[in-house]
Regions:
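Redox-cofactor-proximal catalytic regions of oxidoreductases
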Residues: 73-96, 186-218, 276-285, 371, ...
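Aromatic-enriched alpha-helical interface/lid elements that frame and gate functional surfaces
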Residues: 1-38, 369-445, 449
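Conserved Rossmann-fold dehydrogenase catalytic segment
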Residues: 262, 292-301, 323-339, 360-365, ...
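A short glycine-threonine-serine/GTX helix/turn-capping micro-motif
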Residues: 3-6, 295-306, 328, 360-361, ...
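Terminal low-complexity tails and localization/encapsulation signals of metabolic enzymes
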Residues: 10, 14, 18, 33, ...
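Oxidoreductase and adenylate-handling cofactor-binding alpha/beta cores
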Residues: 308-329, 341, 345-353, 396-403
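Mid-domain beta-loop-alpha active-site segment that forms a flexible
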Residues: 301-316, 335-343, 387, 391
Length: 533
């Protein structure tokens, strides 16, 4: 029974104490080495400094040495990707007006122009235009070996923007696990899979068959970019490493995004989102002050989302680079570095001071109040902040004249000193009120406030509905499905969407016929031989 994931979930209260007892026998380093040696995702819960000093991070050069006029010699995070073995050089924070571009007078018009901005404008307007009105990326083709969330989220962004994303899978042991998320044995009915794979084409090929790799090579020859978020050694084993791809198409843009990158002593580590969050120091910081056992963290897989967004940006940049430079690129995007990039100030603080920053919960050093307050009902909350005197005065007037005149809260410094007392007063006020009523009243007074919404709240949110972000569709396989729309809107470019489920292998023959150029006879023979499975 314990081999069944659903059974383990149902009996977590029994399993977790046993795991804690076992793990407690080892140091962090010992248990990491033991479990990683067996292919089990396990990493230490690092502090920011622990992450910055990790041998893997140092060997990859993520923490770059810089010299700043104010701080002197220190380190700060580099960009979280490596292009053709090189990182983009890090520039320190500019001093005020230190990067003001020299101006010049245009000989054509006599106008005074900014030299750098003019050059950037010229660069930005060069390059091919979209081939039709189906989105700004119409005409771009991506072959994607993605699965679960990080890769699919990035390629969904590309697909929403008009790119032709062809998702590679196989019914012979290579299906995206999200196809079965909460649905049992049917690979074609998971709403979670639909959310992160809509607008894509599903292509199946059996790479265990001798003809499978040549078929993929013919498809890749028609692509602009290839990406994957597999473990670091997978693509080499199946004959799809960058050197092999370049033989198929010399100017291919190839992005790889394993958990800890493609180089470094820990590149072979098995990871999932929660491991990466812990490895980078984010889990350590995600806590209330003084609480260290255990860190609270979050079940939201932030590494997947932030890596997915960066993946989309870098793919677009890589294709633009190829069009201008007439050569491809190999891009190593480490999900761990993409995540650590989110806490850059904490990493810089640790590097500059030699002291680890500590968790501060919901507090802010620049705003009081700044917290999450309980409201009427079961687990209902409202977040309230006051960043300046105007907002504080408006909030204090709502709380009552006694609060507005209380000397403990007169200035921001006073409120910082008496933060706990103020939070208690606000909590007493919010507890008897509906969270949405609290938000509405404070917003009308100009005080930043927002309800901690549930999934159901979001699907009924009037603002999201008014903007067309909440979409209800009737899917032939799933029935009525509520999905989030794409968060960007373009005034002069239409985004054409396909909301039907990307059925496993549905588009294989059409892609081979219309993209690769295979004849019907060839496709029929490949199907008969078991290649297209």
């Amino acid at each position: 029974d314990w081999l069944n994931n659903l059974y383990r979930r149902a009996h977590a209260d029994e399993l977790n104490p046993a795991v804690e007892s076992f793990v407690g026998q080892f140091t962090m380093a010992e248990i990491t080495e033991l479990l990683q040696g067996k292919g089990i995702p396990c990493v230490p819960v690092n502090t920011p400094m622990g992450f910055a000093k990790d041998e893997h991070v140092q060997q990859r050069g993520f923490m770059a040495a810089v010299e700043h006029a104010g701080f002197g010699k220190t380190k700060q995070p580099a960009m979280p990707f490596v292009i053709d073995g090189e990182r983009i050089p890090v520039k320190t924070m500019p001093l005020l007006d230190s990067w003001r571009a020299p101006s010049y007078v245009s000989p054509e018009s006599g106008e005074k122009r900014d030299r750098e901005s003019s050059e950037l404008t010229l660069a930005a307007t060069s390059g091919p235009a979209p081939s039709s009105g189906n989105g700004p990326l119409d005409g771009m083709r991506i072959v994607s070996f993605d699965h679960v969330l990080a890769g699919p989220y990035g390629t969904t962004i590309l697909a929403e923007l008009g790119a032709d994303v062809i998702k590679i899978e196989s019914s012979k042991g290579g299906m995206d696990p999200f196809r079965f998320f909460g649905t049992g044995e049917d690979p074609n009915v998971s709403p979670r899979f639909l959310e992160f794979n809509r607008n894509k084409r599903s292509f199946t090929v059996n790479l265990k068959h001798p003809k499978g790799q040549p078929v993929l090579h013919d498809l890749i020859a028609k692509a602009d970019a290839v990406l994957d978020n597999y473990s670091v050694d997978v693509v080499e084993r199946i004959g799809l490493g960058y050197d092999q791809l370049c033989k198929v198409k010399p100017d291919i843009v190839n992005l790889r995004m394993p958990g800890l990158g493609t180089t470094g002593p820990k590149r072979y580590f098995s990871t999932v989102g929660v491991n990466i969050t812990a490895f980078t120091g984010l889990t350590y910081l995600w806590n209330h002050p003084g609480v260290t056992n255990p860190p609270i963290g979050s079940q939201t897989v932030f590494p997947d989302y932030v890596s997915g967004v960066l993946c989309a940006i870098i793919i677009i940049s890589g294709v633009l680079y190829r069009d201008r430079q007439r050569k491809g690129a190999f891009i190593d995007l480490a999900q761990s570095e993409a995540t650590a990039f989110m806490i850059g100030p904490s990493l810089m603080e640790a590097a500059a001071s030699g002291i680890d920053p500590q968790p501060i919960g919901n507090a802010s050093p620049a705003a009081v109040p700044h917290d999450c307050y309980p409201c009427k009902g079961d687990d209902r909350w409202c977040v309230i902040a006051a960043e300046n005197e105007r907002q504080w005065t408006a909030l204090a007037n709502i709380l009552g004249s006694a609060i507005a005149q209380d000397a403990r809260f007169k200035t921001m410094s006073d409120r910082l000193e008496h933060r706990a007392e103020l939070n208690a007063i606000i909590s007493r006020w919010t507890k008897s009120q509906d969270a949405f009523d609290v938000m509405s009243r404070l917003q009308q007074a100009g005080v930043p406030a927002g309800v901690v919404q549930t999934g159901e709240d979001l699907t009924n949110d009037p603002q999201l509905k008014a903007r067309g972000f909440i979409v209800e569709v009737n899917n032939p396989r799933l029935g009525r499905v509520v999905l989030p729309n794409f968060p960007l809107q373009f005034a002069n470019s239409k985004l054409t969407r396909r909301w039907e489920f990307p059925v496993l292998g549905k588009d294989t023959e059409a892609v081979l016929r219309n993209v690769v150029g295979y004849s019907d006879e060839t496709i029929k023979q490949l199907r008969s031989d078991g290649v297209l499975e």
